[in-house]
Amino acid sequence: MADEKLLKMEEARKVSVENFGKIIRFYAPSFTYYKTSFYSSTPSAFPTISVTGSYCALKCEHCNGIVLNTMLPALTPAELFRLCEKLKMEGAVGCLISGGCMPDGSVPLGRFAEAIGLVKRELGLTVFVHTGI
């Protein structure tokens, strides 16, 4: 079993190197400030955006919806695009788009798909999404 997992990991690494090289890029959402000898965050470089505002149906013990209060709200696709335009003008290189969970654990991102595509294509921002638990 362990040998099988190791082989799968080795194959995954090989595919990764073939497609992306050996460079690993890390993006750090900006909802909290931190500084190390290698990196310090800036509030505008990689902001976090919530498509549900402060709403979360689950209120899980690890967060209780508090993380949502650190995120910028964008409740419609148009709001999301306008917010990303503003963030780009302020120096953002990308953003994390997520939100509170629905009762099934999903984040309602479907209706934002076209706007997210526009943010990537027209604004050139790197976009990460967190789709739920």
Per-region residue spans from a language model:
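Flexible, acidic/Gly-rich N-terminal and inter-domain linker regions that tether
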Residues: M1-S54, L58
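Conserved Radical SAM active-site core
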Residues: P29-F31, S37-S40, P47, T52, ...
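The canonical Cys-X-X-Cys-His
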Residues: C60-C63
